[in-house]
């Protein structure tokens, strides 16, 4: 079905080459609850609108980034 306002916002935020981490997405979607941002992001990955890539950060921690397909 049609994307929700939150889904459309997540996809547009993830439109850059680098993608976005969940923390940044939550910060940019402050009108929405964190759990809703997490749920909608997971749904978008399942639909294929986003892909999740795990990137090793400079501190050796791996971070998941979401990138619009």
PLM feature segments, named:
Residues 1, 39, 56:
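Phosphate-binding/switch region of NTP-binding enzymes
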Residues 1-11:
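Short alpha-helical segments that sit at the start of domains
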Residues 5, 20, 35, 39:
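Charged, alpha-helix-enriched surfaces in structured cytosolic catalytic cores
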Residues 11, 26, 38-41:
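Generic hydrophobic alpha-helical scaffold/packing signal
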Residues 16-29:
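Short acidic, hydrophobic short linear motifs in intrinsically disordered regions
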Residues 31-46:
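Short amphipathic alpha-helical interaction segments
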Residues 45-56:
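A short, conserved structural fragment
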Residues 55-69:
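Short, cationic-aromatic polyanion-contact patches
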């Amino acid at each position: 079905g049609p994307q929700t306002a939150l889904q459309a916002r997540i996809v547009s935020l993830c439109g850059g080459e680098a993608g976005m981490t969940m923390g940044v997405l939550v910060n940019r979607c402050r009108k929405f609850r964190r759990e809703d941002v997490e749920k909608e992001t997971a749904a978008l990955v399942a639909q294929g609108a986003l892909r999740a890539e795990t990137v090793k950060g400079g501190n050796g921690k791996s971070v998941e980034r979401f990138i619009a397909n």
